[in-house]
Amino acid sequence: MEKQSSRRGLLKNAAKAAVAVTGGAVLASTAKAQAPATLEKKSYPAKPRTDPSAAPPLFSSAVSYGNLVFLAGVGYHESGTIEEATKHVLDELEKNLQSAGSSMEKVLKVNVYLNDIKDWARMNTAYAGRWGQVPPVRTTIAPAGGIPGNSLVEIDLIAYI
């Protein structure tokens, strides 16, 4: 009797595994069928090249791929408060999003880099309310070496178009 029940258990497990594999194959083929035939990567240079002999830019200020847009970090390299710096950075990001055909309401992910983590609460006062009804997910860090260009804050993001 024990051999028979262990065989039944083995057969049940094999049947479950077959269903799982078949279901996975169906899902994979469905996803493949729904994927666009070609996705085009579009880059928006950080600074337009006026001199063709000049070296190419190190990075793009924005890159879109499919219906996603990735914005490079924007900082504020002037003197001022963290609130002023954050407002300026968010205003610049909003302009960049609009140029790419998106908006602050369509932002999915934000990375905030603070020169000093003690500015976190004050940065949040300028940050709040800029994203529509559903704010994006966010990570905030204070890099040990600070932010290049002595900015109080730098923000990059990912949005959809």
What do these predicted regions represent?
Residues 84, 105-107:
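Core FKBP-type peptidyl-prolyl cis-trans isomerase
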Residues 84-98:
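Short, well-ordered amphipathic alpha-helical segments that serve as non-catalytic structural scaffolds
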Residues 97-105:
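Phosphate/pyrophosphate-binding loops at sites that engage ATP/ADP/AMP, CoA/4′-phosphopantetheine
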Residues 2-87, 115-161:
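N-terminal presequence-like segments and the immediate start of the first folded domain
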Residues 107-116:
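Acidic helix-start/capping segments at beta-turn-to-alpha-helix junctions
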